Design a protein with these regions (language model features):
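Intrinsically disordered, low-complexity linker/terminal regions across diverse proteins
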Residues: 51-555
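Ser/Thr-rich, Pro/Gly/Ala-heavy low-complexity intrinsically disordered linkers and tails
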Residues: 2, 18-58
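Topology signature of small-to-medium multi-pass alpha-helical membrane proteins
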Residues: 4-6
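Bacterial N-terminal signal peptides
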Residues: 8-20
Length: 555
């Protein structure tokens, strides 16, 4: 997840509405960065007949066929998809590829037309590829997007000859440094009073391999952005005024095969703004469109917090990828500053009945609150909580329900009798940074999804980019779990979550191995990876299994 004092923020501060802001493919010619970081740790544990731990325990797949069969975040075929963001174009949309194996991986990236890159990522190493934004999806750095669009053949197809994990960063940098060799930052526009040129609008997403995608998704995300006008005397939102609409929520659908027919049964707030051949559709209606492989549909709603695609049910006749986002948003309402949020939606069949939701690490090491949302997937879902139900959280859910608990300041466990989803959102810098100032503070909203306990893993290879001031891995584990991070025993970091049988660890990550890390555990664990920079943040699930453990919803 992102920041909200981008160029749009500066402009807005001068106005009434302010924003403080597939395996074995043939190599292709191209360019990129060869990874040079080392990942620590090889798995042990229960062995198969050949003396190896089976994939999904403490050993990642070593072939693309194994990766496809294992159905996890490890794979060989991915689709990177940039969407709407108010960040300046000079900051790079970037994919990061980590090689989970012991042999070099050749990774090809292709885009529209003749766009192509190739990198070799060494064993246990990381490679980055900086990619162009897609103009019709990104929008500009002030007004962003207000209509839907279809970008034909524009998704970035990432194909490796060996299993890897892939993340996308929108953008990667939070300040004007880095990028491809020789990159010029001279066009980066500084904010008034800032000591450097900052992006202020970042987030990141865990990408899922196409072999783990399905055609059924419960849309999980956020409403759009609104904020009350700024009181010039306090430079804060005026609580006596009504919120003004700022940015629209959206979801991105990327087709992996030609002739993919997509139907979306819209939720009660999911109005569609026409564009790109996608028809205007009222909330509660059905919108239908057809895509070919590599096409991206960015479906945009109305502007402001009265609009929300969450709870809508998307079905496609072939596997697709779905990402939800908002160009910039406050969490909670009127808390400075707004930031870009996005995350890949898990297939509906991979959602579970049991979650442990822990408060995230804050920018100064202490845990901080976050906003939690529940997404109903089946009628008649009854929820039970430990140690208690947080204020505002639901006791029951129906299919398509969306319930926002508000700001949650406790760790909790929740179980249901049917599958459901849980979203989490980092708060604005003025909430999470105790040293908050208008000119330089760490934090701002980011979107992630909790991973159900049934999809926990014992090995994670993950990325926490060293481009950020500070990054963490937050771990959920059961009693007696032994944890090793980059070869170091960190089991002592686990602390009990009162009233439950679960433990949480919040571990500050050293800026080593170009940000690539390996976590091993004696029992299945869940992880979230997050980090902070000046008026920005990112967060994503560090990985998960993607077994089909729930029936596809029918409404």
């Amino acid at each position: 997840m992102r920041s909200g004092r981008s160029f749009a923020v500066l402009v807005s501060l001068l106005a009434t509405f302010a924003l403080p802001a597939a395996c074995g493919s043939e190599p292709r010619d191209g360019f990129g960065h060869e990874g040079d970081g080392a990942l620590a740790g090889d798995g042990g544990g229960v062995l198969d007949d050949d003396g190896e731990a089976p994939p999904g325990e403490l050993r990642d797949p070593v072939t693309c066929a194994e990766a496809a069969a294992a159905r996890s975040y490890v794979g060989c075929d991915y689709w990177a998809t940039p969407g709407a963001n108010i960040v300046q174009d000079v900051f790079d949309f970037t994919i990061a590829v980590a090689n989970v194996g012991s042999e070099p991986a050749t990774v090809d990236v292709t885009g529209a037309g003749d766009l192509r890159w190739q990198i070799t990522v060494g064993p246990g190493s990381l490679g980055k590829v900086h990619l162009p934004w897609i103009a019709e999806l990104k929008g500009n750095a002030i007004t962003s997007v207000t209509t839907s669009a279809v970008a034909k053949g524009s998704a970035y197809h990432v194909v490796s000859d060996r299993p890897v994990v892939v993340y996308q960063f929108s953008p990667l940098q939070f300040r004007a440094q880095g990028g491809d060799p020789g990159k010029s930052w001279s066009g980066c526009r500084k904010q008034l009073g800032a000591d450097d040129c900052y992006s202020y609008s970042n987030d990141a997403s865990l990408l899922l391999p196409s072999t783990a995608m399905t055609g059924t998704y419960r849309i999980m995300g956020s409403y759009g952005f609104s904020r009350r006008p700024i009181d010039e005397s306090t430079q804060k939102p005026d609580p006596t005024k009504e919120p003004l609409p700022g940015y629209a929520p959206y979801f991105l659908v990327t087709a992996t095969r030609d002739g993919t027919v997509v139907n979306v049964n819209l939720g009660p707030k999911g109005q569609v703004a026409a564009g790109g051949g996608i028809p205007a559709t009222a909330a509660g209606g059905v919108v239908t469109f057809t895509l070919d492989a590599g096409d991206i549909a960015q479906v945009v709603s109305g502007v402001g917090r009265d609009y929300d695609f969450s709870g809508s049910l998307l079905t496609a006749d072939k596997p697709v990828q779905v990402i939800t986002g908002v160009p910039c948003i406050d969490f909670p309402l009127d808390v400075i500053a707004c930031d870009h949020i996005e995350e890949t939606v898990f297939p509906a069949e991979t959602l579970g009945k049991h979650y442990v939701v822990a408060m995230p690490s804050g920018p100064t090491d202490a845990k901080v609150g976050h906003v939690v949302r529940f997404y109903g997937n089946v009628d008649g879902t009854t929820l039970t909580y430990k140690p208690q139900r947080p204020a505002g959280c639901p006791a029951t859910l129906s299919a398509g329900d969306v319930v926002e608990c508000g700001e949650v300041g406790i760790d909790f466990e929740v179980e249901g009798d049917h599958a459901f989803g849980v979203g989490t959102f980092l708060l604005g810098a003025s909430k999470v940074d105790p040293q908050f100032t208008l000119l330089k503070s760490m934090g701002d909203p980011s979107q992630s999804f909790a991973v159900t306990v049934a999809q926990y893993r014992q090995k994670y290879v993950f990325l926490a980019p060293t481009d950020y001031t500070v990054s963490y891995v937050d771990v959920i584990a059961s009693e007696g779990t032994k944890l090793t991070l980059d070869g170091e025993d960190v089991s002592s970091s686990l602390a009990p979550i009162g009233g439950t049988d679960w433990f949480a660890a919040r571990i500050k990550l050293a800026p080593v191995n170009d940000g690539a890390h390996t976590l091993l555990s004696s029992k299945p664990t869940g992880i979230q990876v997050l980090g902070y920079g000046s008026y920005t943040s990112y967060q994503y699930p560090g990985g998960l299994n993607l077994g089909e453990i729930a029936p596809a919803p029918v409404k």
